[in-house]
């Protein structure tokens, strides 16, 4: 039987407990073995520049890279260097942790998903803030031109004719032509704790009511008193460009919603949509908007 030669203890490779690496270049600066004895300075010049020679275990976790090696899989799997920065990311309050390989290449970023979620949550809160646009001496009517529900369409026509008979200037927002008007109506009705049932009238930025309320105020003469400060229209006429709808087909995609970068030779751009118009392929009429 062959006897295995016993290697002296000094020649056995010592297992590394952790390594301290530079946060900029990824260069290993110091190694600490399982027996507690640190190795010699691997890069004294870089260590002196970075100021990491006197770091302990806790300081190394905050200002440098910590590399841990498993006892069983240290030869099969690549060891990962984890950079834990003490400075928290601005606006998120979480540490940015880069997962690096031995040669310093970035293999992943911890807390990236949570940071992205926090970013989009903050953007949503900003976009949901109430509008600061003033509506002094303005009449805004939210209507629809869809005739799926006949009673709703007839009430919208009734309210429109009432304000036309008073010869006042009003702005009609048709939620069937622009989905943003529907979101705006839901937000404004939510502030006043009212159900968004079309049509809805706002005067001077204040909620006035629906078709029944406008009809009763018109019959009692109260509506005429409210409209005394609203701008009058002596000769009402429809816009020759849009016919009074306030929207025109998109001048870029002509209402098809197809992007100008899309072609018929490949399917890679199938999901691209035109960004110059709304979801219905319409643009605001420049004559009415002006």
From Swiss-Prot:
Record disease entry: Deafness, autosomal recessive, 25: A form of non-syndromic sensorineural deafness characterized by moderate to severe or profound hearing loss which is progressive in some individuals but not in others. Speech development is impaired in some but not all affected individuals, and vestibular dysfunction is observed in some affected individuals. Sensorineural deafness results from damage to the neural receptors of the inner ear, the nerve pathways to the brain, or the area of the brain that receives sound information.
Coiled-coil region(s): none
Protein name, entry field: Glutaredoxin domain-containing cysteine-rich protein 1
InterPro entries: Glutaredoxin, GRXCR1, Thioredoxin-like_sf
Chief site of localization: other
The encoding gene: GRXCR1
Protein family according to the UniProt entry: Belongs to the GRXCR1 family.
Function: May play a role in actin filament architecture in developing stereocilia of sensory cells.
């Amino acid at each position: 039987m062959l006897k295995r030669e016993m290697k002296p203890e000094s020649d056995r490779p010592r297992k590394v407990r952790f390594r301290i690496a530079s946060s900029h270049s990824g260069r290993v600066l110091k190694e600490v073995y399982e027996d507690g004895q640190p190795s010699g300075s691997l890069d004294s010049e870089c260590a002196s520049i970075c100021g990491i020679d006197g770091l302990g275990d806790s300081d190394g976790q905050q200002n440098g890279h910590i590399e841990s090696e498993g006892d069983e899989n240290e030869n099969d799997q690549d060891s990962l260097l984890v950079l834990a920065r003490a400075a928290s990311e601005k606006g998120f309050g979480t540490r940015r942790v880069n997962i690096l390989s031995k040669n310093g290449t970035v293999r992943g970023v911890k807390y990236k998903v949570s940071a992205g979620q926090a970013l989009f949550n903050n953007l949503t809160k900003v976009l949901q803030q109430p509008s600061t646009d003033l509506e002094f001496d303005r009449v805004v009517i939210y209507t629809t031109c869809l005739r799926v529900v006949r009673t709703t369409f007839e009430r919208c026509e009734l309210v429109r004719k009432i304000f036309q008979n008073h010869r006042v200037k009003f702005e009609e927002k048709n939620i069937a032509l622009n989905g943003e008007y529907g979101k705006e109506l839901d937000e404004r009705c939510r502030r006043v704790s009212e159900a968004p049932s079309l049509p809805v009238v706002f005067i001077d930025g204040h909620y006035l009511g629906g078709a029944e309320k406008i009809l009763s105020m018109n019959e009692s003469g109260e509506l005429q008193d409210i409209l005394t400060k609203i701008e009058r229209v002596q000769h009402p006429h429809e816009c020759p460009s849009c016919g009074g709808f306030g929207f025109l087909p998109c001048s870029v995609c002509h209402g098809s919603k197809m992007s100008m970068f899309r072609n018929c030779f490949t399917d890679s751009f199938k999901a691209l949509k035109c960004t110059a118009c709304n979801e219905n392929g319409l643009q605001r009429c420049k004559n009415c908007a002006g």
